[in-house]
Protein backbone atom coordinates (compact mmCIF):
# COMPACT_ATOMS: atom_id res chain seq x y z
CA UNK A 1 0.00 0.00 0.00
CA UNK A 2 1.34 3.42 -0.94
CA UNK A 3 1.32 6.24 1.55
CA UNK A 4 -0.40 9.41 0.46
CA UNK A 5 1.97 12.29 0.83
CA UNK A 6 0.30 15.67 0.90
CA UNK A 7 1.97 18.39 -1.10
CA UNK A 8 3.67 20.94 1.12
CA UNK A 9 2.96 24.63 0.71
CA UNK A 10 6.06 26.22 2.22
CA UNK A 11 5.42 29.59 3.82
CA UNK A 12 5.97 31.76 6.84
CA UNK A 13 2.77 33.32 8.15
CA UNK A 14 3.47 36.53 10.04
CA UNK A 15 0.89 37.86 12.48
CA UNK A 16 1.02 41.33 14.05
CA UNK A 17 4.56 42.14 12.90
CA UNK A 18 4.24 45.17 10.63
CA UNK A 19 6.40 45.69 7.57
CA UNK A 20 7.45 49.00 9.15
CA UNK A 21 9.20 47.06 11.94
CA UNK A 22 12.97 47.77 11.76
CA UNK A 23 13.85 44.07 11.51
CA UNK A 24 11.19 43.26 8.87
CA UNK A 25 13.78 43.04 6.07
CA UNK A 26 15.94 40.72 8.21
CA UNK A 27 12.90 38.47 8.78
CA UNK A 28 12.17 38.33 5.05
CA UNK A 29 15.84 37.66 4.20
CA UNK A 30 16.08 34.82 6.75
CA UNK A 31 12.90 33.21 5.42
CA UNK A 32 14.00 33.56 1.81
CA UNK A 33 17.33 31.93 2.68
CA UNK A 34 15.49 28.70 3.56
CA UNK A 35 12.96 28.99 0.73
CA UNK A 36 9.96 30.31 2.64
CA UNK A 37 7.81 33.05 1.17
CA UNK A 38 6.60 35.46 3.85
CA UNK A 39 2.84 35.96 4.07
CA UNK A 40 1.67 38.73 6.38
CA UNK A 41 -1.69 37.88 7.95
CA UNK A 42 -4.15 40.68 8.67
CA UNK A 43 -6.46 40.90 11.66
CA UNK A 44 -9.42 40.23 9.36
CA UNK A 45 -7.98 36.80 8.48
CA UNK A 46 -7.85 35.46 12.04
CA UNK A 47 -10.88 33.22 11.48
CA UNK A 48 -9.33 31.46 8.48
CA UNK A 49 -7.74 28.09 9.03
CA UNK A 50 -3.97 27.91 9.29
CA UNK A 51 -3.90 25.42 6.41
CA UNK A 52 -5.85 27.72 4.12
CA UNK A 53 -3.63 30.68 4.98
CA UNK A 54 -0.59 28.54 4.11
CA UNK A 55 -2.13 27.50 0.81
CA UNK A 56 -2.31 23.81 1.69
CA UNK A 57 -4.34 22.04 -1.00
CA UNK A 58 -7.75 20.95 0.25
CA UNK A 59 -7.64 23.08 3.40
CA UNK A 60 -10.95 24.69 4.32
CA UNK A 61 -11.04 28.48 4.14
CA UNK A 62 -12.65 29.69 7.34
CA UNK A 63 -14.18 28.11 10.35
CA UNK A 64 -15.37 31.39 11.88
CA UNK A 65 -15.75 34.95 10.73
CA UNK A 66 -13.51 36.94 13.00
CA UNK A 67 -11.82 40.31 13.15
CA UNK A 68 -9.16 40.49 15.87
CA UNK A 69 -7.64 43.68 17.17
CA UNK A 70 -3.86 43.44 16.64
CA UNK A 71 -3.19 43.90 20.36
CA UNK A 72 -5.21 40.74 21.13
CA UNK A 73 -2.12 38.55 20.60
CA UNK A 74 1.59 39.37 20.29
CA UNK A 75 3.52 38.92 17.06
CA UNK A 76 3.69 35.37 15.75
CA UNK A 77 5.66 33.46 13.13
CA UNK A 78 3.99 30.28 11.87
CA UNK A 79 6.14 28.08 9.66
CA UNK A 80 5.10 25.45 7.15
CA UNK A 81 7.17 23.18 4.94
CA UNK A 82 10.55 23.17 6.69
CA UNK A 83 12.63 20.17 7.61
CA UNK A 84 14.58 20.22 10.89
CA UNK A 85 17.83 21.42 9.30
CA UNK A 86 16.16 24.40 7.61
CA UNK A 87 14.17 25.20 10.75
CA UNK A 88 17.39 25.33 12.79
CA UNK A 89 19.01 27.52 10.12
CA UNK A 90 16.07 29.91 10.10
CA UNK A 91 15.95 30.25 13.89
CA UNK A 92 19.71 30.87 14.02
CA UNK A 93 19.40 33.53 11.29
CA UNK A 94 16.59 35.26 13.18
CA UNK A 95 18.60 35.27 16.42
CA UNK A 96 21.70 36.62 14.68
CA UNK A 97 19.68 39.38 12.98
CA UNK A 98 17.99 40.34 16.25
CA UNK A 99 14.49 39.51 15.04
CA UNK A 100 12.34 38.94 18.12
CA UNK A 101 8.90 37.46 17.59
CA UNK A 102 7.35 36.19 20.84
CA UNK A 103 5.21 33.39 19.40
CA UNK A 104 6.52 30.76 16.99
CA UNK A 105 4.91 27.58 15.71
CA UNK A 106 5.26 24.92 13.07
CA UNK A 107 2.15 23.85 11.14
CA UNK A 108 1.08 20.30 11.99
CA UNK A 109 -1.61 17.97 10.65
CA UNK A 110 -3.70 18.95 13.67
CA UNK A 111 -3.25 22.72 13.89
CA UNK A 112 -3.60 23.30 10.15
CA UNK A 113 -7.34 22.75 10.67
CA UNK A 114 -7.59 25.36 13.42
CA UNK A 115 -8.56 28.97 12.89
CA UNK A 116 -5.52 31.21 13.24
CA UNK A 117 -7.09 32.80 16.33
CA UNK A 118 -7.23 29.38 18.04
CA UNK A 119 -3.56 28.67 17.29
CA UNK A 120 -2.54 32.10 18.62
CA UNK A 121 -4.55 31.51 21.81
CA UNK A 122 -2.92 28.09 22.29
CA UNK A 123 0.56 29.54 21.76
CA UNK A 124 -0.15 32.18 24.42
CA UNK A 125 -1.41 29.52 26.85
CA UNK A 126 1.72 27.44 26.29
CA UNK A 127 4.01 30.46 26.73
CA UNK A 128 2.22 31.43 29.96
CA UNK A 129 2.49 27.87 31.30
CA UNK A 130 6.21 27.73 30.54
CA UNK A 131 6.71 31.08 32.30
CA UNK A 132 4.67 29.87 35.29
CA UNK A 133 6.76 26.70 35.60
CA UNK A 134 10.00 28.65 35.25
CA UNK A 135 8.92 31.06 38.00
CA UNK A 136 7.94 28.15 40.22
CA UNK A 137 11.41 26.58 39.82
CA UNK A 138 13.28 29.75 40.80
Feature roles, as predicted:
Residues 1-57:
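N-terminal, charge-rich interaction modules
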Residues 3, 44, 68, 73, ...:
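Residue-level signal for the start and early helices of compact helical domains
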Residues 12, 26, 33, 39, ...:
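Helix-rich interaction surfaces within compact, conserved domain-sized segments
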Residues 22-24, 63-68, 105:
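Residue-level detector of functional hotspots within protein domains
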